[in-house]
Amino acid sequence: MVAALLDRLGVNPALYQSGKHPVHSPIDGSRIGSVQWEGAAEVEQQVSRAEHAFDAWRKVPAPRRGELVRQFGDVLREYKADLGELVSWEAGKITQEGLGEVQEMIDICDFAVGLSRQLYGLTIASERPGHHMRETWHPLGVVGVISAFNFPVAVWAWNTTLALVCGNAVIWKPSEKTPLTALACQALFERVVKNFSDAPPYLSQVIIGGRDAGAALVDDPRVALISATGSTRMGREVAPKVAARFARSILELGGNNAMILGPSADLDMAVRAILFSAVGTAGQRCTTLRRLIAHESVKEEIVTRLKAAYSKVRIGHPLEGNLIGPLIDKHGFDNMQDALEQALSEGGKVFGGKRQLEDKFPNAYYVSPAIVEMPEQSDVVCTETFAPILYVVGYTDFTEALRLNNAVPQGLSSCIFTTDVREAEQFMSAVGSDCGIANVNIGPSGAEIGGAFGGEKETGGGRESGSDAWRGYMRRQTNTVNYSLELPLAQGITFD
């Protein structure tokens, strides 16, 4: 099945059939490919090629660069079903999530095409007669993208489409757990490039490998920007290395996202939002809902409703109409069980969280989503666990709810369910949520392309995708032009 998908997507069989490193599907643990890992020497070669590609590509007008991305979006539309199914096989996502991720790629292509005609600078009034000032934006250089397993194709597209319309060349180092989807994306992109006369060779490249390959990309002084998605631990390694050589980084790291459930909330709507946000993608989104901060007046009722909903959710093969697929691997399962044991030791009451379908899928890790009622926001609650665990804590005072929302190291996404406009506005104010995303009456997951995506604190501070995130992929230049016959100095200085 996977081989047929890869064949239709145009991937050379030699790239996924003859390597020494096996690729296993989280669906059933079966081997779906074997890839050859590349290391520092191959990265060095790729960066050299990317430098040449950048030198040519930056000279191509931005709207023309956008045309390449437009054509890539059309190819993604044509192969959406196949690529979405491949995402399911390699990352364990249910059908709708696999298709949705490819749709994100299509959406960011559309956004980037429009952006290619809107890379606006500024005109600035000069204090000197016969002068004008302006601010312009120019291509940056070689961009390195390091992505995680949980969004194996969308995050690459967020970065690459913007990087391309901004005039850069891209090298992608995907997660070692999801190399096949990366090879497929590269094959689809190359279909477009080979018929696009202005596109130089090696405009986009993929490096398949482990930590050595990623480290080589991060350390190379010719790579102007590293955009890295992953754990906070990974970010702590990447950020100092990039900063030491005065390059740029866009970091999208951990999230420990909360929902404040106010006493006036629509509980029917809240249950639906919690279910999607807390158990979707088996709790393996960076924006997964991990903490429910519920007002004491509604806490018991919402927990009762959630337990009923959790008991009915369909768990199983992600391509067979179920709502929860597997965890990515045994390591993910072990981390979940360790967190639940710690929660019990800290006074929590655990509902769910056990392994499921072990007889049917002995080499895969399906679990029932867990609800954990906690007496307080303890250490385990403040730690991100990449699994479907929802911690529930109560509050009585709205100020306390805001404090709990912000009292974790991470700052990615957050939300409030309320019909009280004062609560909603305060939540979004300067004294409200300290996260990069703060939603009202919608969960923390499912961000749209048009808004910049990213968070604060240990989430890394980077922004990807929409709004003005494109500026991270360009260099700013301030210009002063003297069109007079004099040479006046700023601040009224005389130098005669």
PLM region descriptions:
Residues 1-131:
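N-terminal Rossmann-like NAD(P)+-binding subdomain of aldehyde/semialdehyde dehydrogenases
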Residues 41, 78, 82, 93, ...:
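Short alpha-helical
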Residues 54, 58, 73-80, 84, ...:
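Structural signal for hydrophobic packing residues in well-ordered secondary-structure cores
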Residues 121-269, 321, 395:
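Rossmann-like NAD(P) dinucleotide-binding subdomain of oxidoreductase/dehydrogenase enzymes
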